[in-house]
């Protein structure tokens, strides 16, 4: 991130108000640096223009969603409704909605350059791991949303994960964590029985040792959300919880380029992490 704002704030603040003025100057400069980074432009050969990091995140999200939908052979009405629902959830204005729709349509093309688009996205985000994880979180949740995870969808997600720097093992682990996290959301409660009945998801179950039908999240789900095991001690679990909360902090993600329209999704992620941690503590009798 740019440090020029903090530097100028320090100098000007010191001259105008001495020590305390310098402190105020650094704080204001830091806020300025965050805004400059957020609004800074990046190059995109696919989107044919210099765009802000937030616009790059939004357009890449919908382009890959379009490609993911087409991977099954044809784009269904459910896929279109899912994309429309996401646009509504993000409260996109008319201009950004048009950009999102155009990106979704371009993503459906047979010659969509998936690897190139993801590489440019990764560079545009400054290779910030937390921001890249949030992007992948959106794609995985979208793939789960139609109550099945086809092999063709997994193949697309594998490529996305690979280009974002994840190994196959790390990606499989993330899939397990993301499914477990759904149990702590309202959408997870509503759809989990549909997942259990679906053949495509049954294959996914077998890969992870199987999920039992349930009326709500279990402590095993909570362990998967935090990426810990039942044998880990309180300090290990707390450390994993704090790391995930820090990585997924909504305000920090927005400052690093996450569109403000996706703030609610980031908040839901932290709520899932918090709920999982609370359930573990309750089960273990930890305070």
From Swiss-Prot:
Subunit structure: Homodimer.
Molecular functions per Gene Ontology: protein-folding chaperone binding
Cysteine disulfide links: none
Membrane topology: Single-pass type III membrane protein
Protein function: Regulatory DnaK co-chaperone. Direct interaction between DnaK and DjlA is needed for the induction of the wcaABCDE operon, involved in the synthesis of a colanic acid polysaccharide capsule, possibly through activation of the RcsB/RcsC phosphotransfer signaling pathway. The colanic acid capsule may help the bacterium survive conditions outside the host.
Location within or outside the cell: Cell inner membrane
Ranges in the topological domain labelled Periplasmic: 1-6
InterPro entries linked to this entry: DjlA, DjlA_DnaK_co-chaperone, DjlA_N, DnaJ_domain, J_dom_sf, TerB-like
Protein name: Co-chaperone protein DjlA
Cytoplasmic topological intervals: 31-287
Keywords (A to Z) from UniProt: Cell inner membrane, Cell membrane, Chaperone, Membrane, Transmembrane, Transmembrane helix
Pfam families: DnaJ (PF00226), TerB (PF05099)
Domain-level remarks: The transmembrane domain is a dimerization domain.
Signal peptide residues on this chain, from the entry's feature table: none
GO cellular component: plasma membrane
Stretches that traverse the bilayer: 7-30
Annotated J domain residues: 221-287
């Amino acid at each position: 991130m740019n440090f020029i704002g903090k530097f100028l704030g320090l100098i000007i603040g010191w001259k105008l108000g001495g020590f305390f003025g310098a402190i105020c100057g650094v704080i204001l400069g830091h806020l300025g640096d965050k805004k400059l980074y957020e609004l800074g432009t990046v190059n995109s050969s696919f989107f044919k223009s210099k765009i802000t990091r937030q616009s790059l995140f939004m357009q890449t999200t919908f382009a890959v969603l379009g490609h993911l939908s087409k991977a099954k052979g044809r784009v269904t009405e459910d896929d279109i409704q899912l994309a429309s629902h996401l646009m509504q959830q993000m409260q996109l204005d008319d201009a950004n909605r048009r950009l999102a729709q155009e990106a979704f349509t371009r993503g459906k093309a047979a010659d969509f350059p998936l690897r190139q688009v993801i590489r440019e996205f990764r560079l545009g985000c400054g290779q910030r791991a937390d921001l890249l994880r949030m992007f992948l979180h959106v794609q995985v949740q979208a793939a789960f949303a139609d109550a099945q995870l086809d092999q063709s969808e997994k193949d697309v997600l594998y490529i996305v994960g690979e280009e974002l720097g994840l190994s196959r093992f790390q990606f499989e682990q993330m899939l397990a964590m993301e499914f477990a996290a759904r149990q702590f959301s309202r959408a997870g409660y509503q759809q989990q029985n549909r997942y259990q009945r679906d053949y495509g998801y049954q294959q996914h179950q077998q890969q992870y040792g199987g999920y039992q039908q349930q009326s709500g999240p279990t402590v095993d789900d909570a362990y998967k959300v935090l990426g810990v095991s039942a044998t880990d001690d309180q300090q290990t679990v707390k450390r994993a919880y704090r790391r995930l909360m820090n990585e997924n902090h909504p305000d920090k993600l927005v400052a690093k380029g996450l569109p403000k329209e996706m703030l609610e999704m980031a908040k839901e992620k932290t709520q899932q992490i918090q709920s999982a941690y609370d359930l573990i503590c309750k089960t273990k009798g930890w305070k």
